[in-house]
Amino acid sequence: MDGLEDGPLDASTATSQKPQRQVRLKLTSRHEDIALPESTGPILVPTGLRRYALSTLVNNLLESEKPIPFEFLINGTYLRTSIDEYLTANGISAETTLDVEYVRALVPPLHVASFLHDDWVSAVDVLSDTSIAGSKSRVNAGQERILSASYDGLLRMWNMSSETIALSPAAREGGHTASVKCARMVSPSQIISSGLDRTVRLWKYTESEDGFSASITPQLELYGHKGSVDSISMHAQSHRILSASADHSVGFWSTRKSENPAAPESLLPSNTSRSSKRRKLNSSVSVPQRGPLALFKSHTAPVSAAIFDAKDPTVGYSTSWDHSLRTWDLVTGTLVDTRTASHSLLSVSHMPELSLLASGTSARHITLIDPRASATTVSALTLRGHTNAVVCLARDPDSTYGLISGSHDGTCRIWDVRSTRTDKDGVMGESIYSIPRKSVGGAGKRVGGEGVKVFDVCWDKSVGIVSSGEDKMIQINRGEGVLPNGGSDR
């Protein structure tokens, strides 16, 4: 069984029910290990065939020892009906030879584990052999680490046995003085975080030789924002950080203390009256303090996210509650372009192979935006399915077309941007899987995601889909090859 809805149907069954039209299919795959010989020509099949029968046909042609469940794309769209229904719906003649791409069928991501915290979990990241932070070093299987940030003001490092092996210092020992909103691994030995205390912080991460214990030590405090710093991103090779703040600005920083200017005196804890008590508690810890390389002030509402271009670290993108996505030249600090959507933009992820930016909105959908100046429309595609704000996004590490989103509706949804339909509002995408919070149990969905809002999500090839939220949980889901790869070799 391959878990998809349509049942067994072969050519003989289809043709015995009633006379069928026939159509020629040119079957191709982008994967050499499952590709048919180049000499394979168009194949004449009944138009009544559905996915299951086509999958059986391809397996027979491949002479597979063990059947492989396949999905089929025609003109970039997954076949979800019979071929006949597809032809009728799209006004295509059965005399046409259809180019049909086949890919391995999707595998549902199953729940693997949940890690309980003391408070809401605002952010998660992964250190593994396949993560960006771990790509330059060797992280053995089973030695992966999960970083979490919480509303209790602390960072935690977890092993894969759900044990906390490191905890960041409390405020009086150089830690955050309010809730942490975001945290990311820079490398196996460095962490960055930001939060409601208006700071961006760098930490040194050190593990014992046996890996059973570790430490998170403050290295650098970065001051410049006048509001909560809700999102940060990192480009390790250039040692640069981008931050998104509720003060309407985007911060640009260096992880190197010597490259940052002095911190603005007016923003230091010692010069803010409301922080005097906290400063006394911190008096025993001395952490270097620096300011930003630049603050970009063009947005007219809180900035929700800021990221580097995945292929060019001199370009940055930011999204905001002011409905705009802005493109920045990080070398000159100038605003290059502004794209204005219909709703507040709350999250962003780059899909460079498609020249698109995915942005989650307050209107419960994801809009795919082409940031290039030559683009004639703002939204190239809309992904619908969530029932509350979409606050976090992550790319599928294996597929050019894959994306996962996290929402305040209490679910994560997996998307393949090739899975689309056209209606009166244009081209729409529909999610392939919805991942509920395990903490809900058998109670089903909660209205508006009450108590189980998702705050962050990370998709790692080794560990799986790691999400966090209002239920005080890190949740790990895994499905081998959740999406078929469509643009690069694994």
Swiss-Prot record:
Biological function: Component of the NOP7 complex, which is required for maturation of the 25S and 5.8S ribosomal RNAs and formation of the 60S ribosome.
Region annotated Ubiquitin-like (UBL) domain sits at 23-104
Enumerate the WD repeat regions by residue range: 116-168, 175-213, 224-263, 298-338, 340-379, 385-425, 449-487
Report the source organism. Answer: Ajellomyces capsulatus (strain NAm1 / WU24) (Darling's disease fungus)
What CDD domains would the database entry show?
WD40 (cd00200)
Q: Where is this region: Disordered?
A: 1-22, 255-286
What quaternary structure, including any partners, is listed in this protein's UniProt entry?
A: Component of the NOP7 complex, composed of ERB1, NOP7 and YTM1. The complex is held together by ERB1, which interacts with NOP7 via its N-terminal domain and with YTM1 via a high-affinity interaction between the seven-bladed beta-propeller domains of the 2 proteins. The NOP7 complex associates with the 66S pre-ribosome. Interacts (via UBL domain) with MDN1 (via VWFA/MIDAS domain).
Q: Keyword check for Transmembrane helix, yes or no.
A: no
* Gene Ontology, cellular component aspect: nucleoplasm; PeBoW complex; preribosome, large subunit precursor
Please provide the record's keywords in A-Z order: Nucleus, Repeat, Ribosome biogenesis, rRNA processing, WD repeat
List the GO molecular function terms: ribonucleoprotein complex binding
* Main localization of the protein described in the UniProt heading: nucleus
**Compartments where found:** Nucleus, Nucleolus; Nucleus, Nucleoplasm
Pfam families from the entry?
NLE (PF08154), WD40 (PF00400)
The entry's family comment says: Belongs to the WD repeat WDR12/YTM1 family.
Give the record's GO biological process terms.
maturation of 5.8S rRNA from tricistronic rRNA transcript (SSU-rRNA, 5.8S rRNA, LSU-rRNA); maturation of LSU-rRNA from tricistronic rRNA transcript (SSU-rRNA, 5.8S rRNA, LSU-rRNA)
Q: Which residues form a coiled coil?
A: none
Protein name as it appears in the record: Ribosome biogenesis protein YTM1
